[in-house]
Amino acid sequence: MNLKKQLACIYTNNFFSGLRITDAVWVALLAARGFSLWEIGVAESVFHMVSLTFEVPSGMAADLLGRKKTLVAGGVCMVLSNLLMAFAPDLFFICLAMALSALANAMFSGTASALTYDSLKQCGRTDDYLRVSANCSQLSMLATAVGSLASTLERFLRFSGFYLLSAAFEGTAAAATALMTEPIVTETQARREKQTFRDLPGQLARLVRDSITALRATPLAAKLIVSAAVLCIPSYLTKMFVQQRLVELGWPTALLFVPMLLSGLASMLGVEAGRRLHPESLRRFYAVCALLCGGGCALVGAAPVLGCIFGCMLVQGVIDAYLLHEDQKLNDVIPSDQRATLISVDSMVYSLLMIPASPLVGAVGDAFGQAGAGLAVLGVLVALTGTAALGRKTRAS
């Protein structure tokens, strides 16, 4: 394998897939079209229900059929999702587009990390994973920050224009994926090209058994998965509802890129800080991160404009610092043949929590007449998990 070319393709994919220019404005655009926060929450719940359904199957497909093929298929789904969203006439088609996007993200999650880790493993460079992972994260965040500037083009692009441009970026990311090389680090992976469809049921059954055995043998993996899922809830929902929250406070829609840009900068700084941190106890590290994330989420929900923006930055920076170490530790403790499957369990648990969380946060906001009310409640709950972790005597390293 040409590792230099492989990493170039991985970095290119991370950048263009991160240019999701709709992330900064989609809630505000849908609200401007007459959709309530509850309806937007329903669409988001559809996303997470589909994600929950296909997270583990997509990881299994990646382990059985190949990580590269799965990533390319996900890129195609992402392009179709953006095209459908561009011309969606009602909530049903909005939900259908969200379902396609969720299917694509299910294919990406776990698979991209597994391909990157095993590419380094094939070349005997697993010690470089933290650095490469940090580079990927920072490229994605840089792309997200650049993409957030698209909110300044609202009067020119309109609703459909945002999604058509996003489809072009996703197509470029899929093309970069197609140029990658499938990493081979085990005998099972080497036999992929020779296996027939008749072999797949038996291979699938073996993969399920081996994955369950791996989870039982490594309780630390389960703890890492749950901790990441809990922290990712405020990470996404603050970005989702801060848009409407700022509009309520008088912030112009054309300037919604500013908090998104600053949040992206905070994420990059968080990754850089995480790269330099070496926590002795992941339990204590989680506790501190949960307290900070909870506090930041509460600020987004209850503070005035500057406090709201600072809270969003705090949440994004802290969670990315934690996820960098969680991702490396999880990859270190799970086997290569089940890597994509087990990392997909990580995303599945997140989706399982997001299905009720998204509409509930929106419903609380509708009930109180303020988009931030639900975020304030969520922030308190997340902070309580950090307090509970600090209260336990057992340490997880």
Which sequence ranges carry the predicted segments?
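Helix-loop boundary and gating motifs at the non-cytosolic
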Residues: 1-53, 218-261
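Cytoplasmic helix-loop-helix junction between adjacent transmembrane helices
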Residues: 99-141
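C-terminal ends and interior cores of transmembrane alpha-helices
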Residues: 76-90, 291-304
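Helix-loop junctions on the cytosolic side of multi-pass membrane transporters
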Residues: 166-195, 390-397
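Conserved MFS/SLC helix-loop-helix module at the cytosolic interface between two early adjacent transmembrane helices
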Residues: 52-89
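Loop-to-transmembrane helix entry/capping segments in MFS-fold secondary transporters
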Residues: 37-38, 123-136, 253, 334-346
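Juxtamembrane intracellular "pre-TM" segments in multi-pass secondary transporters
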Residues: 1-4, 181-225
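C-terminal transmembrane bundle of multi-pass solute transporters/carriers
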Residues: 44, 68, 240-397
